[in-house]
Amino acid sequence: MKKIYHFHLYGLLLVLTCTLFSSCIREDIQGNTPEANFESLWKIIDEQYCFLDYKKEVYGLDWNEVHTRYAKRISPSMSWENLFEVLSDMVNELKDGHVNLNSSLGTSQYREWFDAYPRNFSDSIQSNYLKKDYIITSGLTYQILDNNIGYVYCESFSDGIGDGNLDQMLKKLEICDGVIIDVRNNGGGSLTTAQRLAARFTNEKVLVGYISHKTGPGHNDFSDPEPVYQEPSNSIRWQKKAVVLTNRRSYSATNDFVNTMRQFPNVTTLG
């Protein structure tokens, strides 16, 4: 019986499914073949990935050159395992931790965005400050330090941090003279969760950036930039000084969180 493999490409700001069927390939290359699937994946990225021109400017990525180079590794008789390996290598040329190729053969991941940089973070030092009587609420770990400064460690925005969790934490820390929000080594998660936490540090609506959407197949087909605002929470808000600790291993929704927090006058970012 003929085995069918499904390859799924997950990308930043887009979710694409590339299935090994003829409906997922260019019209001029028919059939469920290695060449057809290679051409299909290359074209999907060429037309829908957001950062090709940006990455050409930053590190010289030439997507047409990538096609020429990887096409030489495709042959009609290659196994599905070898095809998956070649396609994975091609996707990794993007150097994007948000873009992975997934199939029943496994999942390819670009890890250098995380592994190639120093941690600048010590669990033992953190444990020394947290001691043993720290509090954990959802995805937040917090403590009042000896100098009456609140310390909050947010390891991930993947956990569902609710408004009740934040109310509880801020009530506990309200006696503090200031607070440290530590998001070092936070790989990201839910942007909504990150915004929910940031909303506790502003009393007014604040412009935090702009966003454009991919609108067509051209590398520069984007909508006009639209402003992005952070709204204040309707519940308890922090009114004193705050410091955000970040490092090179803070990514994705965490980057959005840090960028938002740096717009607030009572917040200082370090890292």
Describe each PLM feature range.
Residues 1-31:
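Bacterial Sec-dependent N-terminal signal peptides
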Residues 23-213, 218-227, 241:
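Flexible, low-complexity junctional segments that flank or bridge functional domains
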Residues 146, 237-239, 264:
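Short, well-ordered coil/turn elements that cap or connect secondary structure elements
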Residues 179, 251, 264-271:
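Short, well-structured beta-strand/strand-turn elements
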Residues 233-236, 240-249:
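A conserved mid-domain beta-alpha-beta active-site/ligand-binding segment of alpha/beta enzyme cores
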